[in-house]
Swiss-Prot record:
Belongs to the PDGF/VEGF growth factor family. This is Platelet-derived growth factor D. The record marks R191, G192, R193, S194 as: Cleavage. Its main location: secreted. Disulfide bonds join C53-C75. Pfam families: CUB (PF00431), PDGF (PF00341). Coiled coil: none annotated. It comes from Oryctolagus cuniculus (Rabbit).
Amino acid sequence: QVTGNGHVQSLAFPNSYPRNLLLTWRLHSQEKTRIQLAFDHQFGLEEAENDICRYDFVEVEDISETSTVIRGRWCGHKEVPPRITSRTNQIKITFKSDDYFVAKPGFKIYYSFVEDFQPAAASETNWESVTSSISGVSYHNPSVTDPTLTADALDKTIAEFDTVEDLLKHFNPESWQEDLENLYLDTPHYRGRSYHDRKSKVDLDRLNDDAKRYSCTPRNYSVNLREELKLTNVVFFPRCLLVQRCGGNCGCGTVNWKSCTCSSGKTVKKYHEVLKFEPGHFKRRNRAKNMALVDIQLDH
């Protein structure tokens, strides 16, 4: 119960925090009040992997009777998380660390309660749509009138573009060129376990084009010969063979990916030599009658 000012923090703050922790604080204030959080400037957790806080992170959630909204998930040490005011009189803070030790100070969050009629500051609005920041890219600052962009809506928007340049033009028409240049700038801060060599410039447009161009291509499938040939009175060796069949997530990354299925434009029949067995007595004098090398046809 929040009745005044206080704080929560990672263990041993501002010294290195322990490994393998999962801590949760649920703050509850009086009716018609809200809870305000402010992070200490000594904020430092394990760095993100590919700009996603996978390993060590602190997460803040708004709690109401009908829903739970993630206001943000933070890690790394470059930026201190913003001041947050809850939308209701309940808020949840979660801290997680994995089994990898890092020499970081952790976090300390100061909390207090405010009267419900006080509006949230513009800098606090819509933080539920942000999980981690990408260094070097200047995002449009949210305002009180900006609508919240959900992950599903953002995913649909990204699916409409084929290049990074067009995507950045859509998000930031005025600063897209600067954003594109900053996107590939190397940063000297600590990178974490998955980063060992100097960051190289990745061709995101080529990766996106390859996924769309080659997702639905022939690939090896293992088929059971008795099931494939619909034969129940014989047995084959080998029991299964590899065939080339069309498959894959053909529309991944496009707006119509759920309605897209891979289908072959052309099929060919190929012969395969296998050993066929027929049921019966396998005495030496009758063995030749029960088995034979045969050619079978399979669709590729």
